[in-house]
Curated annotation (Swiss-Prot):
The keyword Nucleotide-binding applies. GO terms for molecular function: ATP binding; formate-tetrahydrofolate ligase activity. One of its GO terms (biological process) is tetrahydrofolate interconversion. NCBIfam families: PRK13505.1. Keywords: ATP-binding, Ligase, Nucleotide-binding, One-carbon metabolism. It catalyses: (6S)-5,6,7,8-tetrahydrofolate + formate + ATP = (6R)-10-formyltetrahydrofolate + ADP + phosphate. ATP binds at T65, P66, A67, G68, E69, G70, K71, S72. Belongs to the formate--tetrahydrofolate ligase family. The lineage of its organism: Bacteria, Bacillati, Bacillota, Bacilli, Bacillales. InterPro entries: Formate_THF_ligase, Formate_THF_ligase_CS, P-loop_NTPase. It is an enzyme of class 6 (ligase). HAMAP family: FTHFS. This is Formate--tetrahydrofolate ligase. Its EC number is 6.3.4.3.
Amino acid sequence: MTHLSDLDIANQSTLQPIKDIAASVGISEDALEPYGHYKAKIDINKITPRENKGKVVLVTAMSPTPAGEGKSTVTVGLADAFHELNKNVMVALREPALGPTFGIKGGATGGGYAQVLPMEDINLHFNGDFHAITTANNALSAFIDNHIHQGNELGIDQRRIEWKRVLDMNDRALRHVNVGLGGPTNGVPREDGFNITVASEIMAILCLSRSIKDLKDKISRITIGYTRDRKPVTVADLKVQGALAMILKDAIKPNLVQSIEGTPALVHGGPFANIAHGCNSILATETARDLADIVVTEAGFGSDLGAEKFMDIKAREAGFDPAAVVVVATIRALKMHGGVAKDNLKEENVEAVKAGIVNLERHVNNIKKFGVEPVVAINAFIHDTDAEVEYVKSWAKENNVRIALTEVWEKGGKGGVDLANEVLEVIDQPNSFKPLYELELPLEQKIEKIVTEIYGGSKVTFSSKAQKQLKQFKENGWDNYPVCMAKTQYSFSDDQTLLGAPSGFEITIRELEAKTGAGFIVALTGAIMTMPGLPKKPAALNMDVTDDGHAIGLF
């Protein structure tokens, strides 16, 4: 049987005019800023806040295979299922980054019959938010280098500039560069480097801001580097926060699109969860809560990364409690964690599913530690067998875990009704949500709590550089920030080959980064990179554009 590609399905779908999608959730035309017929930005100042805001359902996953486990697909499909049940629902997603689109994963707008549209636009340039973020980030780099070139009144030590340039592409050759070469007219030579745009602090700030004023305040607090006597230098010292916020004045507005089934979707912001906080914008989530009774959103990778940061950073900053959490599992990921090689994942292997269930079990238990009841969604793939699925269901029943087989890729919203009904039962019950740690804990204790309670590790080792940074950060008054762990998504540990549910391992913190604008401290583990590289055969090799301007091979 031949299956249509995601792009073919998207191209065969009939989109509703964006003004009709907006009207379905009470967005007036004067609050809508259309970008063509099927996309728009929303003027949040023209949305009336609700007293009884919508309930937030978070979708996370077990530790993924390199291809991903369909978290975005389940997120969209679950929202469509609520729509099918006549619930007032919106879905809130992150924007895809071009780097992974051309790299290993292809597009990131869901899949099959559970997609947000227009898929081509969203995956490529969308409404220009990433370009604005990239421009603001690199404008700050230009302002820093110009300040040094023009006399360096602030006494910035060019050896201790923390701010890097960014690009929305996987490009390992740009990790370490020299700038200012070519003589005195070209600036002061120094070492620099590039991160991917989704790792930019500007991206994190946009996603954690509540208004333009809040955006400007957060930008002003960015630490760009240090003086020669090691005092922090901020954007406020450079006096360019207004200019940077101006570049972002449209990017801060949430983007409205739709699913194949016409469910309204806000797609806004896109930090990675392995190197940043991995959640869409607070503004999009809160706008959806003002418009809908249920908001389905996602956080990147597994509960150890995106979900932990959603709870400890985003929900804490926004001041809401998630009403339920869906943990996406796949038979292929369970088999991978049970020791099956990538080439054999399509073959039935119930014993491997049994061995790999420990990974899912830890993710389920992690969610319970935040005081929220998890619901497992088995995202169905065509190679799954009845015996494999039945084992997972029996495990769930034995352990009193809610579970539903989810077939939204093939059937759209109808394939997610069982999952939606399970989630509805959970959100109708009170929960006891609480973040994992108190902000008053010292930074090293917050990190240890995440490593021991969420990852299952036994010990944290800090490099000599990280130890010096801990001391310096305390002296600078940065000890009360939450922690954003930068770690491989493939394992609970910092070794991506250690699958399943390892325990007793040590995590090494090699370096810390102070994101004082966004308001968190990044702890870098293992060999994690903030500028990824492309694989030997990037997804770009399968992409093209027709003579009439339509994309080919975009997932």
